[in-house]
Amino acid sequence: MTLIVEAKQRLDAFSLDAAFTSERGVTALFGRSGSGKTSMIRIIAGLARPDEGRVVLDGEPLTETTTGIFVPKHRRRFGYVFQEARLFPHLSIRANLTYGRWFAARTAHGESFDHIVDLLGIETLLERSPAKLSGGEKQRVAIGRALLSSPRLLLMDEPLAALDDARKAEILPYLERLRDETDIPIVYVSHSIAEVARLANQVVVMRDGKVEATGPAIDILSRPSTASDRREAGALLEGTVESFDARHHLSTVALKSCQVHIPGAALAPGKSVRIRIPSRDVMLATTRPEGLSALNILEARIDGMSSTEDGTVEIRLDCGGDIILSRITTLSCERLDLRQGRAIFAIIKTVALEA
């Protein structure tokens, strides 16, 4: 699947001028509120027309302003999941789900009802009414209804934004299964770096109506400039679970040439995972420290340094092929005599499991 999007649009004081190409998997449109993410997804869906541009899916033009092509939204065969579930209150969950079948093309061979129900863990909800469901359950049903329409592309516009942290944690594993167990490409809009780090294969960073960066999630989310808030800056790494220590509730994850220990998560050996290490949680030492509670102390070499306007220094660390980031004060940098190429020890206070 290849999706090509090019769009220019003037909306009152806001100007959109953005383009990207998406391949199979999950492509995240990431950025602050007001950056143009929802405007882009509405153009993809056929809910809005750009002043100039095109939307092409697998070589088929759906919108093309130069030739006047505009395929109506109901003929694009796209599934759309909004911030709110938008279920029919007078129908049971089963009826809400089967309603999606009415929009499937006659020749479409989509996922079966039973498979979607199992995939999203909603077997016990089928005879209930929407009023009896939690926010996370409603969103899972909304996703199931979209999938049962046999979409060529699934568009998800901030689907977790209205949920609290507990409900987000409930639904994220189901979105991972959706990504891993179906062949349906997804365009996922979010301003949450944690959601994007966990789900996305490719990231399109938007700012002020323009595409600022695009590429693999591992690369894009490890750039300090990607974070909308400096507290979110950090490195995203991929690894494999080596073991789980049941006594201490610690999983050991192997990276390219080192290991990290993650508390709390009972992960199966051999499982591929993503971990995120915030730059604010990486301390530096010129000699190996002793007598610390930190479990993860990695040998590294300084691969790059850049000063910021607020009196801090962003330091890029090469840990045997895995790149992590540290943010320290300019004073600390001077006292430690840090410089390009110097060997250093990185003390990691927090490792977040993303997938």
Swiss-Prot record:
Domain ABC transporter: 1-233
Superkingdom of origin organism: Bacteria
InterPro entries: AAA+_ATPase, ABC_transporter-like_ATP-bd, ABC_transporter-like_CS, Mo/tungstate-bd_C_term_dom, ModC_ABC_ATP-bd, Molybdenum_import_ModC, Mop_domain, P-loop_NTPase
UniProt topology in membrane: Peripheral membrane protein
Chief localization: membrane
Record keywords: ATP-binding, Cell inner membrane, Cell membrane, Membrane, Molybdenum, Nucleotide-binding, Translocase, Transport
Signal peptide start and end residues: none
Domain Mop: residue ranges: 291-355
Compartments (UniProt record): Cell inner membrane
Subunit relationships: The complex is composed of two ATP-binding proteins (ModC), two transmembrane proteins (ModB) and a solute-binding protein (ModA).
Function of the protein: Part of the ABC transporter complex ModABC involved in molybdenum import. Responsible for energy coupling to the transport system.
Name of protein: Molybdenum import ATP-binding protein ModC
Species of origin: Rhizobium johnstonii (strain DSM 114642 / LMG 32736 / 3841) (Rhizobium leguminosarum bv. viciae)
